[in-house]
């Protein structure tokens, strides 16, 4: 008779705790860090760890992270589907995949972007601090757990105000290292932006500095799941897994993204307070110079206050979702080839 | 006193969010004082209101120095205060993370830009600030180590402590940082309240500002000369964390001396009422920050102690 290992004990516990069915032996749900709440509740940051049956420890490792912002839900579906596909075909797994589905569980439960008690943006506290307050402590433990990965993908869904086309965002400091991965992520658009100091406190920036190449994906809108965008990203993730030697399945067809480095991004802001009504319907995408993106209307006097016109031939990859706007509100981002 | 609207954000159904400035004296831009940047900073707004009331009287008595101008901005976020939201309520954005601002961007960045255009160029910038965690500080002056900070000037407020800290990435988009990088000597004043009004520490803050303005030759005001401050670096403050969760009873107040091994807090089981943890001081020193909420979660910082300092 063999004694169970600690890992098996944790697995058994988590299966009971979360009512997971053990349909195969490839996955193991671990607690990365936990914090006791004042009244009989523990907040747990979980990860689902997958490795091939005869793992040697030398396999490539991908970390998939999401839920840093509690109002971003597409990543939830992405995690579900990536896990489902790995579980359905464990024989195709030849590397390690760690899925961190929710770094800010309290925010997600409440539909809040930040940590609810402090209204604190968790993506401004990385790399964290083991001696710091709760958010910094959690951030430090998450970073420690991810270190050692060959690649990390941090999945975001904009916020409740702006809708985004599937895109990969890179800080120009890391562009050389990350562009080869970004190009095969099945994104519509890869946006390389200039470095801003405040972004140094994000998970992606911190991990890139600590030697873990990390991509940020943005798509959809807060508090919603866009199935089509999710499926697009899932194909991109499996494509990357194949590239890293982690997955032996059939390579999905992926699109070649438009690169921001070949053109310029125009930001269109409101000149009036009012209601923004989009003229683009459900889908963003290609637009001609002079075409209408939408109107700012006044519901009080029945007037159009401003017609929003595309400044160039290009693609609309960001669009205001919440119609209530003030002067200065970002309405759209249009990428135009130079 | 001259009252003016520095910037206005047009509302959809609400009246415009007007940022009002109060100018005292004329001439050289001497000092600028900013109150509530966040909608829950009621103490900070209250301190500004008391300061404006006092400066009005001083001006009527000719106590503002010749060729010196003081600008006081009680709040930039009237919209947030009126709906009890900390951040700019339309897109839930922290205005104090939008500096130096941008007039071609969203309304919080426009507010930041308009405010910064109005408040830069002053010799001294003073902001009444708040901390994101629930807790009380010993009233103190805080400055970031940008290379332009001046602890000796901060000492002239006459508060007990001056705290310096290395800026984190998120600090680089605050008003204080932008002020310092643009030639203004910038100070943040922390009192021991945020979303409630604490009269005693508000009076202390008003006195500290008037003491500073007097010492810089900007106003003539006769008040107690205050303390010679101890200057401490934030990383020297020893954090004490709770290693469990429940009802929280703090046994020490900011300013209290503690000795190694003293019981400084108790955590009680929220259902059964038993004391489940007595938290002991890990060092001798003075309590600088103390958690205030009636409950505590695991790993929360409940105290910060100035080590090896005595009353």
Question: Each predicted region: which residue ranges?
Answer:
Chain A
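Structured catalytic-domain cores with a bias toward divalent-metal coordination
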Residues: 2-338
């Amino acid at each position: 008779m063999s004694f169970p290992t600690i890992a098996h004990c944790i697995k058994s516990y988590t299966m009971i705790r979360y009512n997971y069915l053990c349909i195969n032996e490839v996955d193991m749900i671990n607690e990365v860090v936990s914090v006791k709440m004042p009244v009989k509740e523990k907040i747990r940051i979980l990860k689902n760890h997958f490795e091939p049956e005869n793992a040697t420890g030398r396999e490539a490792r991908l970390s998939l992270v999401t839920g840093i912002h509690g109002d971003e839900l597409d990543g939830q579906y992405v995690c579900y589907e990536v896990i489902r596909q790995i579980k359905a075909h464990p024989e195709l797994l030849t590397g390690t995949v760690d899925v961190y589905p929710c770094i800010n569980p309290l925010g997600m439960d409440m539909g809040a972007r930040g940590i609810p008690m402090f209204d604190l943006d968790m993506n401004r506290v990385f790399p964290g601090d083991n001696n710091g307050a709760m958010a910094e402590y959690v951030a430090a433990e998450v970073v420690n757990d991810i270190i050692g990965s060959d690649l990390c993908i941090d999945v975001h869904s904009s916020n409740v105000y702006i809708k985004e086309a599937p895109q990969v965002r890179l800080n120009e400091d890391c562009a050389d290292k990350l562009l080869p991965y970004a190009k095969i992520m099945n994104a519509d658009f890869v946006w390389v932006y200039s470095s801003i100091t405040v972004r140094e406190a994000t998970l992606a920036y911190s991990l890139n500095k600590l030697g873990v190449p990390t991509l940020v994906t943005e798509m959809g809108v807060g508090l919603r799941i866009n199935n089509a965008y999710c499926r697009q990203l899932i194909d991109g993730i499996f494509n990357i897994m194949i590239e890293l030697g982690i997955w032996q399945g059939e390579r999905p067809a992926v699109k070649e993204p438009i690169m921001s480095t070949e053109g310029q991004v125009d930001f269109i802001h409101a000149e009036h307070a009012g209601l923004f009504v989009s003229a683009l319907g459900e889908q963003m995408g290609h637009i001609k110079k002079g075409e209408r993106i939408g109107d700012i209307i006044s519901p009080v006097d029945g007037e159009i206050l401003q017609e929003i016109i595309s400044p160039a031939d290009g693609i609309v990859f960001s669009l205001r979702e919440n119609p209530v706007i003030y002067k200065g509100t970002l309405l759209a981002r249009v990428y135009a080839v130079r | 006193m001259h009252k003016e609207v520095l910037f206005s954000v047009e509302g959809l159904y609400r009246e415009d969010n007007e940022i009002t400035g109060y100018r005292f004296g004329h001439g050289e831009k001497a000092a600028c004082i900013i109150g509530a940047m966040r909608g829950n900073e009621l103490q900070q707004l209250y301190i500004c209101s008391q300061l404006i009331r006092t400066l009005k009287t001083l001006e009527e008595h000719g106590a503002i120095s010749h060729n010196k101008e003081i600008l006081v901005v009680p709040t930039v976020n009237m919209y947030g205060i009126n709906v009890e939201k900390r951040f700019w309520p339309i897109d839930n954005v922290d205005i104090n993370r939008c500096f130096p601002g941008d007039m071609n961007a969203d309304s919080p960045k426009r507010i930041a830009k308009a405010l910064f255009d109005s408040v830069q160029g002053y010799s001294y910038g003073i902001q009444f600030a708040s901390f994101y965690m629930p807790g009380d500080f010993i009233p103190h002056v805080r400055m970031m180590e940008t290379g332009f900070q001046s602890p000796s000037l901060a000492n002239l407020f006459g508060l007990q402590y001056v705290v310096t800290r290395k800026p984190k990435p998120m600090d680089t988009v605050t008003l204080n940082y932008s002020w310092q990088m643009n030639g203004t000597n910038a100070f943040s004043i922390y009192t021991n309240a945020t979303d409630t009004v604490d009269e005693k520490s508000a009076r202390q803050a008003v006195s500290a500002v008037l003491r500073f303005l007097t010492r810089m030759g900007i106003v003539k005001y006769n008040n107690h000369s205050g303390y010679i401050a101890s200057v401490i670096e934030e990383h020297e403050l020893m954090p004490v964390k709770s290693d469990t969760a429940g009802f929280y009873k703090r046994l020490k107040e900011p300013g209290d001396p503690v000795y190694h091994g003293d019981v400084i807090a108790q955590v009680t089981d929220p259902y059964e009422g038993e004391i489940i943890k007595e938290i002991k001081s890990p060092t001798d020193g003075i309590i600088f920050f103390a958690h205030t909420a009636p409950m505590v979660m695991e790993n929360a910082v409940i105290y910060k102690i100035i080590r090896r300092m005595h009353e």
